[in-house]
Swiss-Prot record:
The two substitutions observed in the protein always occur together. The keyword Metal-binding applies. PROSITE patterns: HELICASE_ATP_BIND_1, HELICASE_CTER. A zinc finger (unnamed) spans 331-348. Residues 1-126 form the Helicase ATP-binding domain. This is 51.5 kDa protein. It comes from the Viruses. Disulfide bonds: none annotated. Keywords: Metal-binding, Zinc, Zinc-finger. The keyword Metal-binding applies. May play a role in either regulating bacteriophages replication or specifying expression of its own genes. GO terms for molecular function: ATP binding; DNA binding; hydrolase activity; zinc ion binding. Residues 177-333 form the Helicase C-terminal domain.
């Protein structure tokens, strides 16, 4: 499996590998999961001089149905290789069990937490998104979040949020809000909008049209001739906003599209990165704009947030992460854990209802620019304390900045409750920069509360 971020030039690499294989007399079976992707890779093959008479370029369904008549390939290449765990792909792989195979993907990740070791022997990691931005292979971006969704209403069905619960969580006002924020931050620029349902996508397009902005809805049921014309009009700038559900998630390339509008909450990291990075194709002096109306960054971070792809590839990451998950909430002041129904911390008197009020206000707040450092801080604050004192101090400081409170108290509280980690006053003083007296005073306060 070969991992490389969206927009990093996978089609060029695929074309070169295919060309090298055919030059040696080989035959390549190239699998895609959607017919819309065939034209794009065919064009790439032609540009790079790949002899098409030595390549079978098929959707996975068609390939499975033709196994008895296809000439045996010497190499199988799967586009969007994270789909390769599906039964249809597995039948093809089993039929050609002795044929080497490559799977290309931006995201070797499955919501189930399963890995890919049963399908691929190894994974090769490409450059990171951060590297690609710094080296002018992807456009830099500005990320905005409009908290116009009540996430408490989201419900999971078949692995992701159900359309009905998304309808309930979004409400009716989001349609006007999305147009308003597009005008405010990206007026006149080409934008791709991702909705959760055909009805929602059509409503967004109508709202843009009523505001005098040329927008259209397109989906998989749109006739091909009409869809091709709409895509051409979008590329030529006659259409400014292209509203869709899942059609423009993989293999769609419009380098001068500068704006992505996210209106579909998702638990899928794959979907989030494919959609959020759609406007990050590199052009000179281009800065992409990502408008997240559904707070997807809370679950997935930002496009250049670091991910441990090897851990995802090997599998089991979800089970590892769930071992110590407790249906509870943590006091931001003293780190004590309480039932979700708890209104006040019995140890330090922290009022949990303050966060609930702040959350409600935040959902009504203006669109705000999310700084990358803020996201990194949030991710760090959610890490668990461990055996490294310096790392624990970083986590304690991050928790204090994100959730308020005293970082020294958070650190000392952890060591007081831990039955396996320890640190002396002198060691804590050296790492934190606090005096022995300050640390002793803090310990005495905790002792007065029956903690030490």
């Amino acid at each position: 499996m070969i991992q490389s971020p969206p927009g990093s030039g996978k089609s060029v690499v695929i074309s070169e590998i295919t060309k090298l294989a055919t030059e040696k007399g080989g035959r390549v079976l190239f699998l895609v999961h959607r017919k819309e992707l065939i034209d794009q890779i065919t064009n790439s093959f032609k540009v790079h001089g790949v002899p098409l008479n030595q390549v079978e370029l098929l959707t996975v369904g068609k390939a499975k149905n033709r196994l008895s008549v296809l000439r045996k390939p010497t190499l199988i290449i799967t586009d969007e290789g994270h789909h390769g765990k599906a039964a249809t792909y597995q039948k093809i792989y089993e039929f050609y069990a002795d044929v080497p195979r490559l799977g290309f993907t931006a995201t070797p990740w499955r919501m189930s937490g399963d890995g890919f070791k049963d399908t691929y022997d190894y994974m090769i990691e490409g450059k990171t998104v951060e590297w690609l931005i710094n080296n002018k292979r992807l456009a830099p971006y500005q990320y905005y979040s409009l908290p116009s969704i009540d996430i408490s209403k989201l419900r999971i069905k078949n692995g992701d949020y159900s359309n009905q619960s998304i309808d309930d969580a979004l409400g009716k006002t989001i349609f006007g809000d999305v147009v308003q924020e597009y005008v405010k931050h990206a007026n006149g620029q080409k934008a791709i909008l991702y909705a959760h349902s055909v009805e929602a996508s059509q409503s967004f397009a109508k709202e843009f049209q009523e505001a005098g902005i040329k927008a259209v809805h397109v989906d998989a049921k749109t006739p091909k001739n009409e869809r091709d014309k709409l895509m051409l009009d979008f590329r030529n700038g006659r259409i400014k906003v292209l509203c869709n559900v899942d059609l423009i998630s993989e293999g769609f390339d419009v380098p001068d599209c500068t704006v992505t509008i996210l209106c579909r909450p998702t638990k899928s990291l794959v979907l989030f990165l494919q959609q959020s990075m759609r406007s990050m194709r590199y052009q000179h002096r281009k800065t992409a704009i990502i408008i997240d109306n559904v707070m997807n960054w809370h679950a997935h971070g930002l496009p250049d947030t670091h991910h441990d792809w090897k851990d995802y590839f090997e599998g089991g990451w979800k089970k590892k992460g769930q071992k110590n998950i407790v249906q509870a909430k943590q006091c931001p002041d003293c780190s004590a854990m309480w039932p979700l129904s708890q209104k006040m911390c019995n140890l330090c008197g922290h009022d949990f209802s303050i966060e609930e009020k702040h959350e409600k206000l935040r959902l009504e707040a203006e669109l705000e620019l999310i700084e990358k450092e803020k996201v990194k801080l949030k991710i760090l604050s959610e890490k668990k304390f461990g055996s490294d004192l310096k790392k624990n101090w970083e986590i304690a400081q991050a928790r204090a900045k994100v959730n308020k409170g005293n970082p020294l108290m958070k650190l000392l509280y952890f060591y007081a409750k831990s039955d396996w980690a320890s640190a002396s006053i002198e060691e804590i003083a050296e790492v934190t920069g606090k005096s022995n007296y300050q640390i002793s005073q803090a310990k005495e306060w905790l002792q007065s509360k029956g903690i030490y």
